[in-house]
């Protein structure tokens, strides 16, 4: 990801497989002891490069906690202040659990990455998208209060994390794009997100963390906004949303990218799988890019089709690196 020569590119799936995909594969020969959510173990089974993700929830002191129970609960400052004591949990136990992975990462056995929740994602979770859209105009002080609290929480997390295991990279969960571009305007981004991003990214860079924003949809318009606040890259670059990674590389030579392999060709046979990798070959050769399914392998892909995809993926990770 640093645009340096490599022997091969990582053989990596950044997003876990759908639960329905795993259920289908159990009927096609995937060992039943490999359950949905066992990302590390399933990656090992397929011979993918191992990684361990730690998602630090704003609502529960568990990894990969769901947030749906808070969706839309906040409509005013009073609402927020009433639930605030239940937010921003203590993640000390989860962070202590990172220490064994620090050793594995140091020995080259795994890559550790952390996910923090972003300054569009979290207010939207609390308020829902429609309320948040109005709040930018009607209750700006509420949005700023939420994002200041979130910034303080995320900075505390980084300080704690650094004492247990400095990850290779950090993703920021946002999902603030759709198939026609960003869900908010650039002035809204500059007022309500950029000040908090700059402070968070500055600390991440002090820890030598690569920073990648996770946002679905069409990101072309959003990328320069993110780069202006110091973000290094984006994922997953969904092809069906119209993203063109080769164009992004021409526009932004230093942008790091992950994903962009069109998941909808994976069930179409070897020729289609290879054609999609050929589309990505210039991007792979440019550096700073790791190809991966652009958002979870869907249940329409059989176990054998996925094995074929992985075999060809491994091939291209070598040939495209030279």
Spans of model-derived segments:
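Active-site loop segments of alpha/beta catalytic cores
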Residues: 1-37, 49-51, 69-70, 75, ...
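Glycine-rich, N-terminal phosphate-binding loop and its surrounding beta-alpha-beta segment
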Residues: 42-65
């Amino acid at each position: 990801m640093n645009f340096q020569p490599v022997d091969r590119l990582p053989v990596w799936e950044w997003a876990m497989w759908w639960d329905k995909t795993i259920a289908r594969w159990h009927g096609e020969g995937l060992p039943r002891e490999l359950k949905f959510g066992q990302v590390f173990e399933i990656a090992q089974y397929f011979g993918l490069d191992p990684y361990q993700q730690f998602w630090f929830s704003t609502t529960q002191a568990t990894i990969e906690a769901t947030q749906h129970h808070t969706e839309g609960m906040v409509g005013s400052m009073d609402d927020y202040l009433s639930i605030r004591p239940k937010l921003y949990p203590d993640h000390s136990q989860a962070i202590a659990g990172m220490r064994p992975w620090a050793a594995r990462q140091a020995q080259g056995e795994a890559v550790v990455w952390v996910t923090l929740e972003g300054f569009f994602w979290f207010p939207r979770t609390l308020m829902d998208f429609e309320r948040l859209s109005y709040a930018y105009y009607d209750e700006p002080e509420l949005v700023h209060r939420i994002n200041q609290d979130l910034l303080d929480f995320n900075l505390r997390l980084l300080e704690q994390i650094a004492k247990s295991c400095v990850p290779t990279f950090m993703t920021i969960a946002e999902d603030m794009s759709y198939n026609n571009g960003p869900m908010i305007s650039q002035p809204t981004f500059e007022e309500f997100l950029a000040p908090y991003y700059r402070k968070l990214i500055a600390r991440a860079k002090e820890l030598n963390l690569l920073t990648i924003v996770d946002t679905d949809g069409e990101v072309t318009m959003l990328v320069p906004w993110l780069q202006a606040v110091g973000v290094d890259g984006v994922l997953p670059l969904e092809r069906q949303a119209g993203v063109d990674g080769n164009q992004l590389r021409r526009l932004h030579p230093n942008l790091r990218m992950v994903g962009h392999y069109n998941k909808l060709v994976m069930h179409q046979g070897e020729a289609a799988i290879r054609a999609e990798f050929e589309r990505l070959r210039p991007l792979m050769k440019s550096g700073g890019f790791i190809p991966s399914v652009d958002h979870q392998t869907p249940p329409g892909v059989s176990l054998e089709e996925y094995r074929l995809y992985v075999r060809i993926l491994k091939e291209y990770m070598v040939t495209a690196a030279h």
